[in-house]
Amino acid sequence: AIGTRPVNFHLDALKKLGAKIVLKNGYIEASAKKLIGTNINFEGITVTGTENIMMAATLAEGRTIIKNAAKEPEIIDLANMLVSMGAKINGAGNDTIIIDGVNNWTGTEFDIPADRIEAGTYLTAATVTKGEIKIEGINPERLMKVIEKLKTAGATISYTSSSISLNMKREYPNPVNITTAPFPDFPTDMQA
């Protein structure tokens, strides 16, 4: 496990939008007749909290401004999908996101980008097993800190705009110090 993942940021922000939150027998019940846009200032960076509020705010009445928003690529991906469904979102990928509520979403087709944590896990597995791997359909810009650390460990890595190739010829990887932090730094979920 990665550790506790409190949901208070999510719940507090949903309450600010007008949701009624009830904690009952270990479950969270959220309801709202109508959500109203507001200013949300997250006390700490939360990827899923940012995503949850983005989705809720797109259907809220008025404008919602999210400050101290997460900047991970998944935030941009979600914003792009929601915009393709009719949402009005500006600033995804920055620490301030502005959302103007709409009445409804429409259907869409959207290509889901490769999971950078999954790709990083396979690259790491190849590094520690003296392996060789090529991952296609992944944007290496989303994994630059992971690539940097795996090179320090001794892996030979090359990449294009949509693939990463790794070859570990060393018998044992070099030791590597890792400090996790929000994107673009080394992802917390890669430490598990």
Where is each model-derived feature located?
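Structural preference for solvent-exposed beta-strand-turn elements
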Residues: 1-192
